[in-house]
């Protein structure tokens, strides 16, 4: 049943009065006049037209406490409006894209544009050709890479073969040149013979002193090449028949072997104790005659072993004092030709300030604190630091990789050291 308009308004006024009363009670108002009469008034505001009459409802000021959650309603409404605008924009963009696609697909709605159809066909044909060319280009690149790999392999093989061939030829020529040089040095020039009819003997190495009757080990002067100055060497006249020219000696650690290129070139130390004779002098000695090399080693347990090589030659400084050794014999093991990657034969001389080794990531001479014919890096190094006992850390001491038990040390553990080491040479044809 529908209530008449005036009855509905009366109900609204009554509800408003009750709300005001509750508000006054809540605020603690005790004014009798406020409790006696309802401040809400309903009264006519004009003439009636039929069953419809205008009314005016007057309400006092009313404060209602709203929940806190309604405070963020305005922000939420703003976000909703923003999202609605974004959605409307996307819808419009999609509609535009669809219209453009329809225009390109069927302009004018009749599908009769033959020019654009032909153009599309040409574009597809060009794309097909581009894809085909790209595939062929990729195949060509793969083939080029394969050929480059084969070429590098062949290049390395050829370079190794050429290097071995050249080394063999150089070794043979060295023997011949040394032989001829030895013969020529014994034949004085005619001018020299006329000026000095009585000749003094030239001692090219310690074996010449031995042949002439000297049997005491010590320092002697030699002239391996009459075109260069004479110099002193230490001669071992006792070991294995005598006549040995000592190139290097380690006895007590009194000489520092962590030296630069210039020091190893000229030589250093004390001939009576520890020394390196000098690469220039070693070159002259090994150039004048075909030499053999003997290495004597002794550890701190009293074990003494030796290594003998039937050929020994050191090139000049221009060739970086390259080492040439022959076949091995002895008891200490062939540490100079330990393996493929640790082979000191045919290697250049390296010092901490001159990197000529085969190690790609650093300087072996700098890492092992010495000058030597390093490979990548070492299986032998007689110029390492002198340790008076076993040591830890980098294996930078005197080292001979084939010594009994020397490689049994655990990584980071103690490493063996040597009490004595000596390198000496003698002519291959020497007979005590």
UniProtKB/Swiss-Prot annotation:
Domain of life: Eukaryota
Identification of the protein by name: Fibroleukin
Signal peptide stretch: 1-19
Gene that this sequence comes from: Fgl2
Glycan-bearing residues: 24, 172, 228, 256, 329
Tissues expressing the protein: Constitutively expressed in cytotoxic T-cells.
Cysteines paired by S-S bonds: 206-235, 364-377
GO cellular component: extracellular region
Ranges of residues in domain Fibrinogen C-terminal: 197-429
NCBIfam families listed in its UniProt record: GGGWT_bact
Function: Converts prothrombin to thrombin.
Keywords attached to this entry: Coiled coil, Cytolysis, Disulfide bond, Glycoprotein, Secreted, Signal
Record GO biological process: blood coagulation; killing of cells of another organism; negative regulation of defense response to virus; negative regulation of dendritic cell antigen processing and presentation; negative regulation of macrophage antigen processing and presentation; negative regulation of memory T cell differentiation; T cell activation via T cell receptor contact with antigen bound to MHC molecule on antigen presenting cell
Source lineage: Eukaryota, Metazoa, Chordata, Craniata, Vertebrata
Pfam families (UniProt xref): Fibrinogen_C
Subcellular location: Secreted
Main location: secreted
Induction annotation: In macrophages, during infection by mouse hepatitis virus strain 3 (MHV-3).
Coiled coil spans: 71-157
């Amino acid at each position: 049943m529908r209530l008449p308009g005036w009855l509905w308004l009366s109900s609204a006024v009554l509800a408003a009065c009750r709300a005001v009363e509750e508000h006054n009670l809540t605020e603690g108002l005790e004014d009798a006049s406020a409790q006696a009469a309802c401040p809400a008034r309903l009264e006519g505001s004009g003439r009636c037209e039929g069953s419809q009459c205008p009314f005016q409802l007057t309400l006092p000021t009313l404060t209602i406490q709203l929940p806190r959650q309604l405070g963020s309603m305005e922000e939420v409404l703003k976000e909703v409006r923003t999202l609605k605008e974004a959605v409307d924009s996307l819808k419009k963009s999609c509609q535009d894209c669809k219209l453009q696609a329809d225009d390109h697909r069927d302009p004018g709605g009749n599908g009769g544009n033959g020019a654009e159809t032909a153009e599309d066909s040409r574009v597809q044909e060009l794309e097909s050709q581009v894809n085909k060319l790209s595939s062929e280009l990729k195949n060509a690149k793969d083939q080029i890479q394969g050929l480059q790999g084969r070429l590098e392999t062949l290049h390395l093989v050829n370079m190794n073969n050429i290097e071995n061939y050249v080394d063999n030829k150089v070794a043979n020529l060295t023997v011949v040149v040394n032989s001829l040089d030895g013969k020529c040095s014994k034949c004085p020039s005619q001018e020299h013979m006329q000026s000095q009819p009585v000749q003094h003997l030239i001692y090219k190495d310690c074996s010449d002193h031995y042949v002439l009757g000297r049997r005491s080990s010590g320092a002697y002067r030699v002239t391996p090449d009459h075109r260069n100055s004479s110099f002193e060497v230490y001669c071992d006249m006792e070991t294995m028949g005598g006549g040995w020219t000592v190139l290097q000696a380690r006895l007590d650690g009194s000489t520092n072997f962590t030296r630069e290129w210039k020091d190893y070139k000229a030589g250093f130390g004390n001939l009576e104790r520890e020394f390196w004779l000098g690469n220039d002098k070693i070159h002259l000695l090994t150039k004048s005659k075909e030499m053999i090399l003997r290495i004597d080693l002794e550890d701190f347990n009293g074990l003494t072993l030796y290594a003998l090589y039937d050929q020994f030659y050191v090139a000049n400084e221009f060739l970086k004092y390259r080492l040439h050794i022959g076949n091995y014999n002895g008891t200490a093991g062939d540490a100079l030709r330990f393996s493929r990657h640790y082979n000191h034969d045919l290697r250049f001389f390296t010092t901490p300030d001159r990197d000529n080794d085969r190690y790609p990531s650093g300087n072996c001479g700098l890492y092992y604190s010495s000058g030597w014919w390093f490979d990548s890096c070492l299986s032998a190094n007689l110029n390492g630091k002198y340790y008076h006992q076993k040591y830890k850390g980098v294996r930078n001491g005197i080292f001979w990789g084939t010594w009994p038990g020397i490689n049994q040390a655990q990584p980071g553990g103690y490493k063996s050291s040597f009490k004595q080491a000596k390198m000496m040479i003698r002519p291959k044809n020497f007979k005590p």
